[in-house]
């Protein structure tokens, strides 16, 4: 649960809205600290097929943002959507949301001993450094 401008939002509901987009294979939503709103939702998503180019990827990310706003309201609209090749997971398949949040807030991701694929976390780092977002 994240608190966006006094509204308590479930990350699962936002993930389900993003996942309803036909291009999305998998999504993770985290709350990132924001001076004005307290927290804002940020989406990390993998696509079913690789986008043709950066413009197509940004268009898909913008569509995801609109899908969330249409289904859950403007308050749930993600501040950013990052398209990554894979989401960081444990060996048992659980998403490492705390690591995603730490990287998004430029903090140390902490203990990564359970990380299944280190390349997934490195991809997230690269995407965050490039600022490849849709808004």
Predicted feature residues:
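A cross-kingdom feature marking charged/low-complexity
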Residues: 123-135
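AMP-binding/adenylate-forming catalytic core of the ANL superfamily
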Residues: 1-76, 85-86, 93-95, 99-102, ...
């Amino acid at each position: 649960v994240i608190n966006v401008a006094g509204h308590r939002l479930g990350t699962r509901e936002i993930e389900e809205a993003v996942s309803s987009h036909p291009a999305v294979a998998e999504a993770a939503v985290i709350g990132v600290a924001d001076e004005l709103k307290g927290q804002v939702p940020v989406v990390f998503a993998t696509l079913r097929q690789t986008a043709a180019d950066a413009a197509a990827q940004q268009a898909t990310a913008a569509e995801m943002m609109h899908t969330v706003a249409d289904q859950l309201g403007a308050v749930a609209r993600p501040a950013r959507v990052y398209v990554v090749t894979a989401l960081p997971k444990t060996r048992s398949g659980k998403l490492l949301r705390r690591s995603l949040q730490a990287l998004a807030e430029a903090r140390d991701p902490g203990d990564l001993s359970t990380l299944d694929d280190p390349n997934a976390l490195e991809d997230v780092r690269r995407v965050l450094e490039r600022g490849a977002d849709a808004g």
